[in-house]
Amino acid sequence: MAKPHETILVLDFGGQYNQLIARRVRELHVYCEMHPYTISVDAIREMNPKGIIFTGGPASVYEEKAPAVDPAIYDLGIPILGICYGMQLMVNQLGGKVGRAESREYGKASLTITASEGPFAGMEGDVQCWMSHGDKVEVLPHGFVGSGKTDHAPFAAMADPVRRFYGVQFHPEVRHTPQGMDMMRNFLFGVCGCTGEWTMENFIEEQVAAIRARVGSGKVLCALSGGVDSSVAALLVHRAVGEQLTCVYVDHGFMRLNESERIIKTFRDELGMNLIAVEASERFMAKVAGVSDPETKRKSIGNEFIRVFEEEAAKLGQVDFLVQGTLYPDVVESGTSTAETIKTHHNVGGLPEDMKFELIEPLRTLFKDEVREVGQRLGLPEDIVWRQPFPGPGLAIRVLGEITKESLDILRHADDIVFQEIKKAGLYRQIWQSFVVLPTTVRSVGVMGDGRTYEYPAILRAVTSDDAMTADWARLPYELLEKISNRIVNEVKGVNRVVYDITSKPPGTIEWE
């Protein structure tokens, strides 16, 4: 079905900033979709996009089997912006020449604008940009003019205003290109003729109508975790079909302090939704008893969740649809043609293939910040809208080693202290995730009072991120770190040392397991 809104098509060549391109387009209130570069010309015609963006990628266009689009795309009469590899591909396919650069360009560079065309409309002189490439354009295709240059790249940008084809060798989508959003705005509104009419209000209206039409009189089931993703998905479906939706919340015993009680109260009492709460902590503890391998933990918990969920679903009789809070980054991180699977993801592919439900994934095209906005507009309580991401297996993968009731209690208490202090410092919304990891296979010597102690260290992890695809360790104030450390060591029995993890992603992941 054709999209009801003006659409920008982003073609994915495997670059590290590709999702960021889509995010920037959405920030300008223009709907966009990302598709593999192998998409057919017929599919593009059916989509009828206002413009196409070719992303960056790790390949070189002159290599054998380098990713390339169907050349017929250039005959559609649709504006195209090529970014980094995307620009080089345009050059290569349209008759120009790309070669290896004498010196690579990585990081900040000064771009001299030589033609105020397309993305550079209204700009002149030198602007800062972010480069990440080892190849350069040597000869422009017929019809193009150079529109920007750097010390190492004579054609750092190009323009063919007649066909509305543009290319930039740098990355306008990253914050390190300060005028990058202006360039994106110029392309979307000036070149493609977009009006910026896509909003979260529109999204809600359209999703509610689409869900209502699809479900009809059918019964809908939702596995509710209490996180922002499944909560917003459930609330959106509830807005569409009301009592036809039943939510199942499985308390596996690995939640944070008082979290299960808060989830049940919110959805059953405050939001008036049909909620079945299953207390299954003993079942889950039995499944992970003696298990220390992280992937085995994840799979054991995931499999047991499926069994509990299936049992509850069977009690409801005929159910036609299943709601999942899948987001766009979930799909990418669980593996696509251009992104390797990093670890078993708890949302995507977590339910058995033989379950006789049709999937409803109303948030599948959204990023986390958009989901939060939808939640706010639907009236979801602030503490859930801004709840930090929490892994499906919960605290089970934050206890390194075997899980016991004692280790879970220690971790819960320490984690709650971090939550309290970060919130009190006014930093909770600025931080993507902040939590404690408890390595039960390690003990450290300490001195408390007049005696020596031999207890667990607690690892504090706090990161900043836009979408969890990349993350940086949070520069928490020393005074806050000191307060957290003092409270944990003094108030949590079993911990005598606190350390702070200052690893970014990559090379690390946000979670330890």
UniProtKB/Swiss-Prot annotation:
Origin: domain of life: Bacteria
Glutamine amidotransferase type-1 domain mapped to chain residues: 7-197
Annotated positions binding ATP: 225-231
Keyword Nucleotide-binding: yes
One Gene Ontology MF term: ATP binding
Enzyme Commission no: 6.3.5.2
Gene3D superfamilies found in the cross-reference section: 3.30.300.10, 3.40.50.880, HUPs
Protein's name according to its UniProt entry: GMP synthase [glutamine-hydrolyzing]
Originating organism: Heliobacterium modesticaldum (strain ATCC 51547 / Ice1)
